[in-house]
Amino acid sequence: MTEFSSKERYTMIRVLVIDDSATMRILLKKLIDKNEHMECVGVAPNPVAAQELLRETRPDVITLDIEMPKMNGLDFLDRIMRLMPVAVIMISTLTEAGSESALRALELGAIDFIAKPKLDFAEGVQAYAEEIYRKIETAGRAKVKKLTRDVPPVRMDAEPPAKPLLAEAGKDGRVVAVGASTGGTEAVKELLLSLPADCPPLLIAQHMPEPFMRSLAKRLDLLCAMRVKMAEDGETLRRGCVYIAPGHSNLTIDATAAGYVCRIVRNAGEAQSDSSVDELFRSVAAAAGARGVGIVLTGSGSDGAAGARAMMAAGAFNIAQDAETSVVYSMPDAAIAACGINEVLPLEKIAGKLMELDGA
């Protein structure tokens, strides 16, 4: 009888590493090959050197550095997503420039990104091992779409258009809570682009580190009719305003005599907790009850499922993005399984349903 290794008993995720740092290439290869469900099928110092490897190895996932000689990661990403779409995870620095580049990569079709460690390089990558494994596993089962049109870059140095400051949201109005993870930045953007300037207040919990959240808020504010900003503790919710949870904190709301206020709960680490969507949803259930609307967008894991159930128990109306338009369906699917969803819709129909509920 033939004996198989533990790796051979599973469908392996084949990973190609492209990074100009020899240290990063060695460490990523070592980490990937330690995981029994993954195999590093090749490493390359730049996209030019990677082109032949890409054809030969046909990887399931690519980890791609952004800043590299000969051809930068964004140009290479644009090319491969048009010609040979594959799940790509970007490797980005935790800086404003790195954050903007990572968000641009997501626009071009990258599945996710991993932030480079700030401190001791080897120790930092070792500490990120579980995140690397989780994101590669998610990318390995993600829905990859071919890039079929030009995606103009957002001019981040532009001034946002003037937007009127609308009235505070009273307790008789709708309050919308949105949760997302993998694939969520583009889903959130599409949702917001479909909403009018006077929509009910939206609160967004998106699994991303702090610098990326600031860049996301700025980018969305330039693109959308509503005001988009980082949520601040104690500020009153207004119509026409989108409040994004800081990457290092959970966002919740409290009810006051006049309306609702944001509450920011700082976490011990640099990232939101794994239950940031649940925390937001539970607070909306308690504060807004039947005037709440919950939206669970594409994402990995089950964050939001328990919170969606709490919102539904309080009388709220909850929407899940459908499998067809989700990059990763885990979060919507978990919320549906928890009996926390009223309606499942393709992404392009969620804004219309939200405005229908706002008028009800």
UniProtKB/Swiss-Prot annotation:
The active site is at S181, H207, D303. It is an enzyme of class 3 (hydrolase). CDD domains: CheB_Rec, REC_CheB-like. Its EC number is 3.1.1.61, 3.5.1.44. One of its GO terms (molecular function) is protein-glutamine glutaminase activity. It is found in: Cytoplasm. Phosphorylated by CheA. Phosphorylation of the N-terminal regulatory domain activates the methylesterase activity. The keyword Hydrolase applies. The modification 4-aspartylphosphate is found at D65. Residues 14-131 form the Response regulatory domain. Keywords: Chemotaxis, Cytoplasm, Hydrolase, Phosphoprotein. GO terms for cellular component: cytoplasm. Its main location: cytoplasm. It comes from the Bacteria. Residues 169-360 form the CheB-type methylesterase domain. Pfam families: CheB_methylest, Response_reg. Belongs to the CheB family. Contains a C-terminal catalytic domain, and an N-terminal region which modulates catalytic activity. Involved in chemotaxis. Part of a chemotaxis signal transduction system that modulates chemotaxis in response to various stimuli. Catalyzes the demethylation of specific methylglutamate residues introduced into the chemoreceptors (methyl-accepting chemotaxis proteins or MCP) by CheR. Also mediates the irreversible deamidation of specific glutamine residues to glutamic acid. This is Protein-glutamate methylesterase/protein-glutamine glutaminase 3. The lineage of its organism: Bacteria, Pseudomonadati, Pseudomonadota, Betaproteobacteria, Burkholderiales. The gene is cheB3.
